[in-house]
């Protein structure tokens, strides 16, 4: 039986895998370029949107880094994040854990302080004005060196109270988690939470490295773990949450169609899967669109969607009190 759209909308949502730079809508890209006196290689908003029709991860990343170049000032980052929070609140997202890529900004001469201050201002406003709580996760670009990641971490540590953890993203193949074992150990010593993208395009061994060498608290993507039975059993035994991104997987050809997506199989095996939007402006949908699309394609029922939300609450880095509050909101939905 199809899930009632009213239930889908009313369902409280928790997003654990959202790149704030990936929420840059074409309209905002054009507006920020104008505000900052920058020339885009596109004649219109429609031309930008047409460029969002890419075929693979690398083509997407090339466009993603080009797009983020319009982000220059503290106000730009605040506006970007507030636009995301407003969309999230409209879809009944209660809590979001947001990646940001400082190296993509500092390499362009943008001060790290401006990035963090703008995002933090938006987070405070979102909680006060919209009731959306959030955390920031500083993400290292894996195509760069570990030395550069160390430098970014050291530069960010004076702002330690503004971000809860570190992550690892960008081009996966050829950049295994092992490359960043020392910087993750340093982050762990600072009391930061640890997450990493692994097993999206990279092999199951990358997931194993993220567990063994990075000692992650949460696994981002993780789809290819399903190719390794021993790894599946380990993830279940350890209660490791996976931040799964269905529309992202479809757009980047990780799956050929959503009917072949492994999300339902993950749930049925007992994996702690969650639904997330990843880079929603590029991949065609925020939390509600991801849930609706995968619910239809995989014939999910309301109990599956409740489980996905409960998993996300449990796997979040929110306080115990906030988690209890969100579980109560979930239980109240009929």
UniProtKB/Swiss-Prot annotation:
Active-site residues, Swiss-Prot/TrEMBL: 200
Annotated site, Important for catalytic activity, chain positions: 221
Binding site for Zn(2+): 17, 19, 197, 278
Cofactor details (free text): Binds 1 zinc ion per subunit.
UniProt xrefs under InterPro entries: A_deaminase_dom, ADE, Ado/ade_deaminase, Metal_Hydrolase
EC number in record: 3.5.4.2
Keyword Metal-binding among UniProt keywords: yes
CC terms in the record's Gene Ontology section: cytosol
Cofactor(s) essential for the protein: Zn(2+)
Listed GO MF terms: adenine deaminase activity; zinc ion binding
Coiled coil: none
KW Metal-binding (keyword) present: yes
UniProt catalytic activity: adenine + H2O + H(+) = hypoxanthine + NH4(+)
Biological processes, Gene Ontology terms: adenine catabolic process; hypoxanthine salvage; nucleotide metabolic process
Pfam families membership: A_deaminase (PF00962)
Enzyme class: hydrolase
Residue sites binding substrate per the record: 279
Keywords assigned: Hydrolase, Metal-binding, Nucleotide metabolism, Zinc
HAMAP family the UniProt entry points to: Adenine_deaminase
Family: Belongs to the metallo-dependent hydrolases superfamily. Adenosine and AMP deaminases family. Adenine deaminase type 2 subfamily.
Role noted for this protein: Catalyzes the hydrolytic deamination of adenine to hypoxanthine. Plays an important role in the purine salvage pathway and in nitrogen catabolism.
Protein name as catalogued: Adenine deaminase
Record organism: Rhodospirillum rubrum (strain ATCC 11170 / ATH 1.1.1 / DSM 467 / LMG 4362 / NCIMB 8255 / S1)
């Amino acid at each position: 039986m199809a899930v009632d759209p009213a239930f889908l909308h009313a369902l409280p949502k928790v997003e654990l895998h959202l790149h704030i730079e990936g929420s840059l809508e074409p309209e905002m890209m054009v507006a920020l370029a104008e505000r900052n006196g920058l020339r885009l290689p596109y004649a219109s908003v429609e031309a930008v949107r047409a460029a969002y029709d890419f075929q693979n991860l690398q083509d997407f990343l090339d466009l993603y880094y080009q797009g983020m170049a319009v982000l220059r000032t503290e106000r730009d980052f605040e506006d970007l994040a507030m636009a995301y929070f407003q969309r999230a609140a409209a879809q009944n997202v209660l809590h979001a854990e947001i990646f940001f890529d400082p190296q993509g900004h500092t390499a362009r001469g943008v001060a790290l302080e401006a990035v963090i201050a703008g995002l933090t201002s938006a987070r405070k406003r979102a909680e006060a004005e919209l009731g959306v709580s959030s955390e920031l996760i500083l993400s290292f670009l894996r195509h760069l060196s570990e030395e550069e990641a160390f430098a970014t971490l050291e530069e960010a540590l004076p702002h330690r109270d503004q971000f809860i953890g570190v992550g690892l993203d960008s081009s996966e193949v050829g950049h295994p988690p092992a490359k960043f074992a020392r910087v993750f150990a340093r982050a762990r010593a600072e009391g930061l939470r640890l997450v990493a993208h692994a097993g999206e395009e990279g092999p199951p061994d990358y997931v194993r490295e993220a567990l063994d060498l990075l000692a992650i608290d949460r696994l981002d993507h993780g789809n290819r773990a399903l190719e390794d039975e021993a790894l599946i059993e380990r993830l279940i035994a350890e209660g490791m949450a996976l931040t799964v991104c269905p529309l992202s997987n479809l757009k980047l050809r990780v799956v050929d169609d959503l009917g072949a997506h492994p999300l339902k199989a993950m749930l049925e095996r007992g994996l702690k899967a969650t639904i997330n939007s990843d880079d929603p402006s590029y991949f065609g949908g925020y939390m509600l669109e991801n849930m609706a699309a995968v619910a239809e394609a995989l014939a999910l029922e309301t109990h599956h969607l409740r489980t996905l939300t409960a998993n996300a609450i449990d796997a979040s880095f929110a306080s115990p009190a906030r988690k209890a509050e969100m579980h109560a909101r979930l239980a109240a939905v009929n």
